Design a protein with these regions (language model features):
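Plant-biased recognition of short, low-complexity, intrinsically disordered N-terminal tails
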Residues: 1-5
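Structural alpha/beta surface segment adjacent to cysteine/selenocysteine redox centers
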Residues: 27-145
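C-terminal cap of thioredoxin/glutaredoxin-like
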Residues: 8-14, 18, 25-41, 52, ...
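Short, surface-exposed alpha-helical recognition segments that flank or form part
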Residues: 20, 78-81, 174
Length: 232
């Protein structure tokens, strides 16, 4: 994300592929990084590394094709009116991001375990850059294009578009058990850390930030770290 500098800030973002706040929080983190690295008062500007860790908000979600997203939310969150309010609030949050997120709540929701396997595969194949491309592709698939996050065909298309695997190789991977144990271990690790909601961002392996904080909040923490004013 930047050339090597005197200060490296490591971010581990625990998230789920069907968590809208994870998408918003990720966009806010990227915006905070861009603004900080453009700040002439910080010289040299800090270097950031990002890695995603797995979490499932709802392990009971059925496999693809899953079930209607809105109907599931209505049962889980307390009815149609409450869900409509939640959806509208999230649409507004998305449009405030830079670049904007165009949340669309049609389509189905299904189990996210295979999406997490693909995210981990991206890290194995190409490190941070590949993983970020896959995460961004998955967020866009589910939240902006009403795609099925559990569909092997949809996931394989994300993998191919990100350049980590050809589509047929991605389908072969998804049909296997490769990285299943590693992802399940990641779920357990989040639980052992006491993470009960996402996004949850761990900075420099020591400092935890819960939720999709505002861009300015992330930026202030990063700025203090870069200036040596915050010791973790």
């Amino acid at each position: 994300m930047a050339s090597a500098t005197d200060t490296t800030i490591e971010l581990e973002i625990t998230s789920d592929s069907v968590c809208p706040f994870c998408y918003v929080g990720y966009r806010r983190i990227l915006q905070a990084i861009r603004e900080l690295q453009a700040d002439p008062s910080l010289s040299p500007s800090p270097h950031f590394t990002l890695r995603f860790a797995p979490f499932q908000l709802d392990p009971t979600l059925p496999p693809s094709p899953g079930e209607n997203k809105i109907e599931r939310y209505e049962r889980r969150f307390g009815g149609k009116e409450k869900v409509q309010t939640m959806v509208q609030a999230m649409v507004e949050r998305g449009r405030e991001c830079e670049p904007p997120i165009e949340f669309s709540y049609g389509g189905n929701v299904s189990n996210t375990k295979d999406s997490h396997r693909l995210i981990e595969k991206a890290w194995v194949v190409g490190g941070e850059e590949a993983q970020r491309k896959v995460v961004e592709g998955l967020f866009a698939l589910y939240f902006e294009h009403e795609g099925d996050i559990g569909s092997h065909d949809a996931l394989a298309t994300v993998a191919a578009d990100a350049g980590i695997l050809g589509k047929e190789d991605a389908l072969t991977f998804l049909k296997s058990d490769e990285l299943k144990d590693e992802v399940e271990e990641g779920f357990k690790k989040a639980q052992m850390r006491g993470i009960s909601g996402v996004p949850f961002t761990i900075i420099n392996q020591q400092f935890g930030v819960s939720g999709a904080q505002e861009t300015e909040t992330f930026k202030e923490v990063f700025r203090k770290l870069a200036k040596g004013e915050l010791q973790l």
